[in-house]
A protein has these predicted regions:
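C-terminal and inter-domain tail/linker signature
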Residues: 1-141
Length: 141
């Protein structure tokens, strides 16, 4: 795995899977810019990263992220990420359902001195909401 993809995997392992909030200081710049649409109430910058990780860990257990195919160019890396977990706490007004989920996301990260300085992302939130039972799955024809 290339260096940028390794840093993306390390971020997910340390924060989302292990709950190591101190790792955010080691892996994210103080003035990080996140271009992905945030969760309701999510602040900007590094505090927004902490908010995201905390909210996800409060709502889901057994969180695991696996970095798949990745490409790198200069100070940037892009990776497909598979995220799995179980819905064991309230998430955006949806009470815990104890349902498991598996979703995909794409992360594009610009690094400065080995830290995430800028992030663009797309996450399949529709699949997440369907899998935890918040919205119905489409009818099969």
């Amino acid at each position: 795995m290339a260096e940028g993809a390794e840093l993306i995997q390390k971020f997910y392992d340390e924060t989302l899977s292990n709950g190591n909030m101190d790792a955010i200081d080691d892996l994210v710049t103080d003035d990080v810019v996140d271009h992905e649409e945030g969760l309701p109430g999510q602040p900007e910058g590094k505090e927004g990263v902490r908010f995201f990780v905390s909210m996800m860990r409060e709502a889901f257990s057994d969180l695991k992220a696996t970095v798949g195919p990745a490409v790198e160019s200069g100070d940037m890396a892009s990776a497909e990420v598979t995220i799995t977990g179980r819905h064991t706490g309230e998430f955006m007004g949806v009470p815990a359902t104890d349902k498991s989920f598996e979703i995909k996301s794409i992360d594009i990260v610009r690094f400065e001195d080995g830290k995430c300085a800028e992030h663009w992302g797309v996450t399949d939130n529709m699949a997440l909401m369907m899998q935890i039972g918040a919205i119905p799955e489409p009818a099969q024809t």
